[in-house]
Amino acid sequence: MRLCDTDIERYLDDGIISLTPRPNNDKINGATIDVRLGNSFRVFREHSAPFIDLSGPKEEVSAQLESVMSDEIIIPEGEAFFLHPGTLALATTLESVKLPANIIGWLDGRSSLARLGLMVHVTAHRIDPGWEGKIVLEFYNSGKLPLALRPNMVIGALSFEVLSGEXKRPYSSRKDAKYKNQQSAVASRIDEDKE
């Protein structure tokens, strides 16, 4: 069952769900709570790699990823990150999210931003039970104009569902959890996938 605004507020008050810094209650709407853009970004840098072999040997995949991803880019407050048409960038939410083992979260982009061509998450919008950390956003500008993205702007909304029971393998307890406690725009760790 998806939580309504009253339950989201109560779960935050009771510490069942945690968002740090906690958004004001006026950011809770119907069945969602707004989240803001953090200041950590990563982009694909200019490279000569013809492709990345996603099923190749782990060492080669790791080297290919390292050759195409930028280091972390920190955008100072008041400045903007410009996302150009046809460009993918990684960023984070300002808020760090912590979920218990019986709640799953969902991230949705804002309709107003989508109407300008901004995709906030390319495919990964599920926040696993037991998650703790910032949410990495996979931005894609499918529009015709560059978009100025500023830290602290409302970038999306989270909704939450209570599971039928407590997950046996919540994200926080998995040894293979590649993005546990992430606090920055972490690049793909597909090279760490199990065989």
UniProtKB/Swiss-Prot annotation:
It is an enzyme of class 3 (hydrolase). InterPro entries: dCTP_deaminase, dUTPase-like_sf, dUTPase_trimeric. CDD domains: trimeric_dUTPase. Pathway: Pyrimidine metabolism; dUMP biosynthesis; dUMP from dCTP (dUTP route): step 1/2. It catalyses: dCTP + H2O + H(+) = dUTP + NH4(+). The keyword Hydrolase applies. GO terms for molecular function: dCTP deaminase activity; nucleotide binding. DCTP binds at R110, S111, S112, L113, A114, R115, D128, V136, L137, E138, Y171, K178, Q182. Residues 171-195 are annotated as: Disordered. Keywords: Hydrolase, Nucleotide metabolism, Nucleotide-binding. GO terms for biological process: dUMP biosynthetic process; dUTP biosynthetic process; nucleobase-containing small molecule interconversion. The active site is at E138. Gene3D superfamilies: 2.70.40.10. The keyword RNA-binding does not apply. Its EC number is 3.5.4.13. Belongs to the dCTP deaminase family. Catalyzes the deamination of dCTP to dUTP. Homotrimer. This is dCTP deaminase. It comes from Haemophilus influenzae (strain ATCC 51907 / DSM 11121 / KW20 / Rd). The lineage of its organism: Bacteria, Pseudomonadati, Pseudomonadota, Gammaproteobacteria, Pasteurellales. The gene is dcd.
